[in-house]
Amino acid sequence: MEQKWWHNAVIYQVYPKSFKDSNGDGIGDLKGITSKLDYLEKLGITAIWLSPVYKSPMDDNGYDISDYEDIASIFGTMEDMEELIAEGQKRKIKIIMDLVVNHTSDEHAWFIEAREHPDSPKRDFYIWRDEPNGIISAFSGSAWEFDEASGQYYLHNFSKKQPDLNWENEELRHHIYDMMNFWIDKGIGGFRMDVIDMIGKIPDQEIISNGPMLHPYLKEMNQATFRDKDLLTVGETWGATPEIAKQYSNPKNQELSMVFQFEHIGLQYQPGQPKWHYAKELDVPKLKEIFTKWQTELGEEEGWNSLFWNNHDLPRIVSTWGDDGNYRVKSAKALAILLHLMKGTPYIYQGEEIGMTNYPFKTLEDVEDIESINYAHEALEKGVSLEVIMDQIRHIGRDNARTPMQWNDEAEAGFTTGRPWLAVNPNYKEINVEAALADPDSIFYTYQALIALRKEYPWLVTADYELVDAADKVFAYKRVEGEQAYLVVVNLSSQEQELPLVNGVEEVLIANTKVEQVLESGKLAPWDAFCVKLA
């Protein structure tokens, strides 16, 4: 495998609205991010994945773009963006842009022209039909919206203010490639591609994901934009299998560097149930099965794994699969050790490195997320109690990830001098960056150590993965390179568990426990986790 910079990189996702506010308006901004680059450099990350900062009416927090080549005024100016890129480069931190090209805002100039002038070439940039079919929006209800002016319906797989683009239109595709080159020329390090598996859709057959033209479009995009550039490109692909992931990320196919697959995230939900029916506990044997499949089937010559627990759409992992009560610190470290020593590129979501938790939402008035609000109204109409709905939002709602970053124990957690757009988690007095940096045993320093290991040890990139037989609640695996093996053992429970057989430990590489005592007793205390080099 030809080594690329992203093979031993660690990416840090910033959700700009919630990261750091520099001007007191309660909304995070680009200058705020730039002001915290020294902190991210201390953590050791290679690149920032920046959620959208483009011009937008903010119907879906920036994933509804009205101008791809301008910056939303709430985040700052193009000069602020250029400063962030330049200051990142000084610290060897690349900026990866969020590319949202399945849809635009209904306030984009293309859609305004398409709507007002049905004979315009821009009309065909979107998907119009005389009658709707059965496609359902990801945000509830029909994905078709009637436009009275023209008497036709347009497709929106998300909000009605996010009309889907028609990728069959060649002129549209080349506008998108020109826009990507605009950002590449500004010195960015790559693109995270939002719901990219939807661009090949065939609406008349109700095929939304993985349509037949998806991969030809991505090959064309590759050739027109990043082919000869050393850029990281990662696609969001909810329905991917290892075979599908290889189509995207096999270097011979000349498409993307890697994809986000969500099979493990599916364990957060009850089998066969919609998203809001969350699973009461983690099915650890199933988690082992899923990770092992992806680690072994996505071979290094044919593809590459993205490793993540959190993003801006998902609840906090320490609350979902950790124990954010008695074992918050230890379980957060355990989950980090489990993930970061696998094969692939790890992604950290802001606040994960200090163990930020889900928010204790009490009423619907506390909620900002359009998906959660739409679901709540739909569920209330069906007779679901508000108590049940609020419990679901506390466990699954996207706002859990979007509460402001907790910098210190001062007012509003040091995020803003004003009133934050979304309430700060009340636990910020205990859980904040300042406290983490002052405590040598904090979660932060475990993440810092894991990132340093990835830079120091080539085997983390290249070694094979082997699942090790262990108790149901214990996830153990080896990374094997030639004669040398490294063992990772993690107790994914708040109960004592049996230690799997360990022969000949030469060195402890990282742990959240006293490994010698564990080896002597043969017992794993709750959330024990370690990696050792075997003799």
Region spans (language model):
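Aromatic-lined glycan-binding groove of carbohydrate-active enzymes
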Residues: 189, 292-313
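Beta-strand-rich binding/interaction modules
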Residues: 496-514
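Flexible loop/turn segments at secondary-structure boundaries
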Residues: 56-57, 103-105, 198-203, 240-245, ...
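C-terminal beta-strand-rich structural cap/linker in extracellular carbohydrate-active enzymes
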Residues: 519-535
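Acidic/aromatic-lined carbohydrate-recognition and catalytic surfaces
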Residues: 2-177, 181, 185, 196-251, ...
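Active-site clefts of carbohydrate-active enzymes
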Residues: 202-203, 304-325
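Loop/helix patches that line or flank the sugar-binding groove of alpha-linked glycan CAZymes
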Residues: 5-6, 225, 232, 239, ...
